Amino acid sequence: MILGIGIDIIEIIRIKNAIERNSKFMKRVFTEKEIKYFEKINFRHESIAGRFAAKEAIVKALGTGFRNMKITDIEVINDKVGKPLVELKGGALEKIKVYKDVKIHLSISHNRDNAIAYSIIEGECI
């Protein structure tokens, strides 16, 4: 059954400005794995904004906000063909432990100005 749906859209320029204004932004928001991915793609702002929107969409699908979790508890990585995958840790993982067979679906897209992410979380009550 569907446990939650989340969507987020962000202007790419907002992420670009946040990175330029605050040297700690990347480490505060993204995991080491995510930052290594950004290094490989030359820190493209549209990709960074898409990952940020993905984290926000997942939190909305969880339905709890960031209470008792950090944004880095949500890690967005890619499979071998580039499909975005989600790994939950810490407080985010705790929020889904009350369900079994949890699947997190994620789609990320962007145009010149905006990045958008859509997430669906499926699972069964224990």
UniProtKB/Swiss-Prot annotation:
What Enzyme Commission number(s) does the record list for this chain?
2.7.8.7
- Where on this chain does Mg(2+) bind? D8, E56
Gene Ontology MF annotations? holo-[acyl-carrier-protein] synthase activity; magnesium ion binding
Q: Which InterPro entries match?
A: 4-PPantetheinyl_Trfase_dom, 4-PPantetheinyl_Trfase_dom_sf, ACPS, Ppantetheine-prot_Trfase_dom
Which Gene3D superfamilies does the record associate with it?
Answer: 4'-phosphopantetheinyl transferase domain
Protein keywords = Cytoplasm, Fatty acid biosynthesis, Fatty acid metabolism, Lipid biosynthesis, Lipid metabolism, Magnesium, Metal-binding, Transferase
- Localisation: Cytoplasm
Write down a Pfam family by its short name: ACPS
Tell me if Chloroplast is a UniProt keyword of this record.
no
Tell whether tRNA processing is among the UniProt keywords: no
Q: Which cofactor does it need?
A: Mg(2+)
* Main subcellular localisation: cytoplasm
- What GO biological process, any one, is recorded here? fatty acid biosynthetic process
What reaction does this enzyme carry out catalytically? Answer: apo-[ACP] + CoA = holo-[ACP] + adenosine 3',5'-bisphosphate + H(+)
Q: Name one GO cellular component term.
A: cytoplasm
Q: State the protein's purpose.
A: Transfers the 4'-phosphopantetheine moiety from coenzyme A to a Ser of acyl-carrier-protein.
- Family that this chain belongs to: Belongs to the P-Pant transferase superfamily. AcpS family.
Protein name (Swiss-Prot/TrEMBL): Holo-[acyl-carrier-protein] synthase
What is the species listed in this Swiss-Prot or TrEMBL entry?
Clostridium tetani (strain Massachusetts / E88)
